Amino acid sequence: MKSEIQIVKEEIDKIEQIVEALRQVKEYVWNSVNTEINIITEIFMRLIEKAQIIIDEGGEFPIDIVLQQIKNFNEALNMKDEILMADTLQYEIVNTMYVYLELLEEK
């Protein structure tokens, strides 16, 4: 069974491949995006749960930024905008997954 850290690292690799395909406007790219939606959503849900624990324990976490990134991802998906999706994945989703990795590795 894969660890949460391994799952997130593998997803980051997949997203980076999708970003490259989006920038090259490959035919199959939206199928790849659709395939990864559930995994991205699951990772972000676990991140939000972890963030809530941090907040409940008196810590700080920019959960509003994470929620905005999810909204941006959904907007790009609904618009089928390759540039917006590539930017959202590369500069928002992947960066947030790296933050989540740091949280997981602190355990």
Model-identified regions with their sequence ranges:
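C-terminal-biased regions
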Residues: 1-107
